[in-house]
Amino acid sequence: MLKKIMVIIVIFAVVAVVYPYKKLAQTGFQFLSVSQVSRASGMGEAFITICDGADAVFYNPAGMVLMRSRLFEVSVNNLQWIADIKYSSIGMVFSPFERRYGVFGMSIMWVDYGVFYGTMVYPSLDGYVETGTFSPRATSIGVAYSKNLTDRFMVGGQIKYVALNIGRTVIPDAISETGLTAKDFVASVTAFDFGTVFRTGIKSLVFGMNIRNFSKEIKFYREGFQLPLTFTMGVSFDLLDLVDSEKRGNNSLLVAVDAVHPRAYPEYVNLGMELKLFGTFSIRAGYKSNQDEYGTAYGFGLEKFGLKFDYSYTPFKNFDGVQRLTLKFSI
C-alpha cells in the first residue's frame, strides 16, 4: 500500500514539473476559477486539506470521504460576483454501505452574466447597427468519487461537463449572399479533477494535493484555448492540538496554507485561519498573495442539528465587495 501511495505522489510531482510555466493568460472558461463555498472564501481559499463532504467537490474531491454525516450531505451556494454576474452552485455527496465502497458526489454550477446589447459595424452615421440582446450562460455538471486507501490516505476524482454560451453574433461570410452570417458561439468540453489528502498521524497535521480543470484544448470559432488548469499543494494544522485537551474543550484553531500554480497567472499562496468555538460558531480570515484586485477575506459560520450556515465577504479595490452565502444540510 505504501508503494501505491508513493506512486500517486510521484505522479502529482511530475505533473507539477512538466507544467507549462511560460504560458500565462492562455485560458478561457475563467468562471471555473471563482470560489463557490463561503467557508473556503472566508479562509482565503486555503482549503484543499480541510474541505470535506459536499464542499470538497469544488476544491479537492479526495475530501468527500471525510464527510461528517453518515449518509447524505448537500451544500447550496450563492454569490453576486463583480459586474452583476450571478453564480449559483450545489454540491452533493452520498455514502452508501457505511463507506465500504467510498463516497459518491455530484456538483452543479451555473452562471448568469446578465443581458447585453449586440452591435455590428455598419456604414451609417453611428458606424454601427444594433443586432439585439443576448444573455451569456455558463454551466458545469460533474460526478465525483472518493475513497480511503488507508486510514490516513484518501484519493478522489471528478469528471465534469463544462459549457459556455456567449450568445449569437453576426460575422463576415464570403459565401453568403449578404456577406454576413449569424453564428451561435457555444463551446463545451469534458474536464477532470484529481486530488489526495494525507493525514500524517502527527496530531492534526494534514497534507494535500490536487489538479483541477484538466482537459483538451477547445475553441469557439478559430483560435483554441485551454481551461484554467490549476495545481495546488496544501498543509493544515489545528493549533489547539498543542493545548491540553481539557483546556481546549470543543474548540479548534485551524491554520491552512495552499501554494497554487495556475496556468493563467503567476504562482501565489493562500493563507487561512478558522477559530471554532463550542463546535458551533466559527470566525474566519484569509489572504491571497500576488493579487491585483483583492487579497483579504473574512467570514463566519453557524452549525447545529445537521444544519450549517456560512457567510464570507471579499473586499475589492475597484469593485463592490463580493458576498457569499452557503447553506448545508446533512443526515
Each predicted region: which residue ranges?
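Positively charged n-region of N-terminal signal peptides that target proteins for export
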Residues: 1-4, 151
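Sec/Tat signal peptide C-region and signal peptidase I cleavage site
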Residues: 15-20
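Sec-dependent N-terminal signal peptides
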Residues: 4-14
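Subset of outer-membrane beta-barrel
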Residues: 21-331
